[in-house]
Amino acid sequence: MRVVLQRSKEASVTVDGEIVGQIPFGLTLLVGITHEDTEKDATYIAEKIANLRIFEDESGKMNHSVLDVEGQVLSISQFTLYGDCRKGRRPNFMDAAKPDYAERLYDFFNEEVRKQGLHVETGKFGAMMDVSLINDGPVTLIVESK
């Protein structure tokens, strides 16, 4: 499992002109799932993200987690994170999980994030989405389970 995590001042996701998910501040997650991922990977990533100390304390050091600052999470499914661009000019997405499997694991992942005590908004799995955010910092990390 691969997640691109962005610390966000605000974020939203729109499908067909309608906002389907929105947070005031917290973390925006682009979530990629490969066919080898399991529920164990999803739980590991959910716990890691909830507890990563990437929000600043009073002295400007990254000492607080999204839980500590009472932030929220906007989770967006993103199969293109497993695009392989090493050969040719068109990405190969063979490492991305099949949609049925990926959607089930993506839903499980979001529930695991909620179990950590976080409010989670989502996009619409498999839809063409417009994602808007104000990246705070910018702080952008890649979190992987393997």
Curated annotation (Swiss-Prot):
It is found in: Cytoplasm. Its main location: cytoplasm. Pfam families: Tyr_Deacylase (PF02580). Signal peptide: none annotated. Its EC number is 3.1.1.96. InterPro entries: Daa-tRNA_deacyls_DTD (IPR003732), DTD-like_sf (IPR023509). The keyword Endoplasmic reticulum does not apply. GO terms for cellular component: cytoplasm. A motif (Gly-cisPro motif, important for rejection of L-amino acids) lies at residues 137-138. GO terms for molecular function: D-tyrosyl-tRNA(Tyr) deacylase activity; Gly-tRNA(Ala) deacylase activity; Ser(Gly)-tRNA(Ala) hydrolase activity; tRNA binding. It catalyses: glycyl-tRNA(Ala) + H2O = tRNA(Ala) + glycine + H(+); a D-aminoacyl-tRNA + H2O = a tRNA + a D-alpha-amino acid + H(+). Keywords: Cytoplasm, Hydrolase, RNA-binding, tRNA-binding. GO terms for biological process: D-amino acid catabolic process. Gene3D superfamilies: D-tyrosyl-tRNA(Tyr) deacylase. Belongs to the DTD family. A Gly-cisPro motif from one monomer fits into the active site of the other monomer to allow specific chiral rejection of L-amino acids. Homodimer. An aminoacyl-tRNA editing enzyme that deacylates mischarged D-aminoacyl-tRNAs. Also deacylates mischarged glycyl-tRNA(Ala), protecting cells against glycine mischarging by AlaRS. Acts via tRNA-based rather than protein-based catalysis; rejects L-amino acids rather than detecting D-amino acids in the active site. By recycling D-aminoacyl-tRNA to D-amino acids and free tRNA molecules, this enzyme counteracts the toxicity associated with the formation of D-aminoacyl-tRNA entities in vivo and helps enforce protein L-homochirality. This is D-aminoacyl-tRNA deacylase. The gene is dtd.
